[in-house]
Amino acid sequence: MGAVLSIPLALASSLSGVVGIASSFLVTSVLSLTNSIQSNVGAVISYAVLYFVNSLLSWCMLSSWFNSKLSKLSAGYLQFDCQNDGKCYSVIAVHRLSFTLVMFHLFLAFILSLCNTRSRVAIKIQNGLWPFKIVLWFVLGIFSFFIPTKFLSFWGNIISVMGSALFIVYGLMLLVDFAHTWAERCVDRVLTSDSSSSKFYLIGSTVGMYVVGLVLTILTYVFFCASSCSFNQAINTINLLLCIAVSCLSVHPTIQEYNPRSGLAQSSMVMCYTCYLILSALANRPDEGQCNPWGNSASGTREFSKVIGAAFTFFTILYSAVRAASSRESDDSYSYLYADSHDMGVSTPLEDGSSEEDKHQSDYNFIWFHIVFVLAAFYTASLLTNWNTTSVYENQKNDVFVRIGFSYAAVWVKIITSWVCHGLYVWSCLAPVFFPYRFMI
């Protein structure tokens, strides 16, 4: 009995040692930031550091060296090895840390929902109390390693995939908004100051993104569209036709009449990203020989996909924060793209008589801020595990085994989100025609 009781204690001690350095670094950096920057900027940076450390630990869980050390420190309680029989816990460990970050932000969102967002109490909870937050994150991390593996398998296969899909859709809305905003600013500079650099950036980036999208499409045809792979051929062809359609739509005379700034610059960005999504989706298809030659061999391509996905994640978080902070200072002509989320992301102006400090510190909705991080945690876990699915079973000796493999769920998530991206961009082009009073040129 003593030996059994000592296992959880040894595990907690081991995990404390593993994440101790990261936690110490996090506490030091966060406290120094929040002490020097008493504003939303300090809070955003602090939460970003926490997200980065949690993601870094999740990535370490996929390292054989890190897992072997942690297994030894836990006296064999934690097993992370991936053997030929399919026994593998490293993917589950990633979902455990994802669960930690999700519960952390959901808890803060729940607490903040009980307070008035404009109150000093809510501002204090959002921007301060970092020693308590670090302890909360640490305790949740320890607790996550005692959650049954079967629950984590359900978490990773169902909940995490749905959360990842929502994060991608939200990121796509921001991507379309960014495409319009960036292109319009370049056009404005060209029209007002005849800036040669703006012309170069606008034309060069447009051509460059079309070239990248075309190259990705060709690579998809070459590697994934063999004569027997009709599904891959259909998906890639549909995406190519959609790219051509949205490009033609962006320069249609009617669209240009209601929004002269619309053009190929925005559609090129949409094409570039959707072509990447299709390539990534087919690369995640369960290995069926010629239809997915990257299924088991090309680990480098999967690492590249992780890098692109990580860049997309940080872009979404950063741009979401920037939009929330700056939206009150500029008119948003494309707010109809994401009216609900934008309304949640930015609160209404404070009533007259409020202090300048409150006006500065409560210019966005704290609850939506944490929801974005919840979705980002889901997406990061799916990204690090290559959207793998897990199946848990027990043998006659009651040993728990976890099988790792690809599934069509991840494939369809990426395919559908690419179609959603096209749909969002089409809507952004047509909305000024249908609702000209909401579109201010």
Swiss-Prot record:
| One Gene Ontology cellular component | plasma membrane
Keyword field: Membrane, Transmembrane, Transmembrane helix
Q: Where in the cell is it found?
A: Membrane
According to the UniProt entry, the coiled-coil residues are: none
Q: Does the keyword rRNA processing apply?
A: no
Keyword Transmembrane, does the record have it?
yes
Name of this protein: Membrane protein PB1A10.07c
Organism classification = Eukaryota, Fungi, Dikarya, Ascomycota, Taphrinomycotina
